[in-house]
Amino acid sequence: MYNGILPVYKERGLTSHDVVFKLRKILKTKKIGHTGTLDPEVAGVLPVCIGNATRVSDYVMDMGKAYEATVSIGRSTTTEDQTGDTLETKGVHSADFNKDDIDRLLENFKGVIEQIPPMYSSVKVNGKKLYEYARNNETVERPKRKVNIKDIGRISELDFKENECHFKIRVICGKGTYIRTLATDIGVKLGFPAHMSKLTRIESGGFVLKDSLTLEQIKELHEQDSLQNKLFPLEYGLKGLPSIKIKDSHIKKRILNGQKFNKNEFDNKIKDQIVFIDDDSEKVLAIYMVHPTKESEIKPKKVFN
């Protein structure tokens, strides 16, 4: 039985669910879950939690992501990416803008911005996913959502051809960010229809492309009994949270029993959640959170016995 976080390289054409389904067959275990959906046409890093690490999947999801995308100016689509039908076209020429214009424009997208999620997305409105409305040719009002663009920059020259302009960007962002919407919004700012024509996730939850294994590689390592060496411990998935190492055996026991504590027994500055780690074994003992009604106390959120 495997326990840990496995960064998978998801190839284009597979859904995230496909990856989990195939892994369950390869590893012969049902206790597997991914940490955030990647669209079928998107390749890249998909961290998968296995065994007891499934308990930290939410925290891996919260740790942020990085992407490399190709923005195509001059044509918009129904899905905001290359898979959709053409909505609008408008010829683009090198006299319309240059790379300095793009660089200045991208600066405006840094920080917390608002996005309207695409109709072809899994965001729910009135209990129904947006893509379900889209497939029935229905349109609904989509609420704006705030997303965090930690960094964005151009990483290629501008390529003007066949009345379109293509260039690559790298984006570091928080969860819930739609890169294809970012591409269309860049077009709007330039005064042109636009879409995202290619996307690769290069980092997710602290895992990067060089850490990631294809399904074929995973199958091979499993058959050689050497896959466990490629798994990251569940503690890795909690590195985005503050932590305290516990030496006292009596306190360890109280933590594992799920007892409440006064904040000043540890660090009175605990604002939200804290991870308790066994100083001897380096294993996580529990995740505690500030009590919702008694701010001076912390209570267990997850205990790892």
From Swiss-Prot:
Gene Ontology biological process: mRNA pseudouridine synthesis; tRNA pseudouridine synthesis
EC number from the UniProt entry: 5.4.99.25
Gene3D superfamilies found in the cross-reference section: Pseudouridine synthase (3.30.2350.10)
A GO molecular-function annotation: RNA binding
Broad enzyme group: isomerase
The keyword Transport belongs to this UniProt entry's keyword annotation: no
UniProt KW tRNA processing keyword: yes
InterPro entries in UniProt: PsdUridine_synth_cat_dom_sf, PsdUridine_synth_N, tRNA_psdUridine_synth_TruB, TruB_C
The name this protein goes by in its record: tRNA pseudouridine synthase B
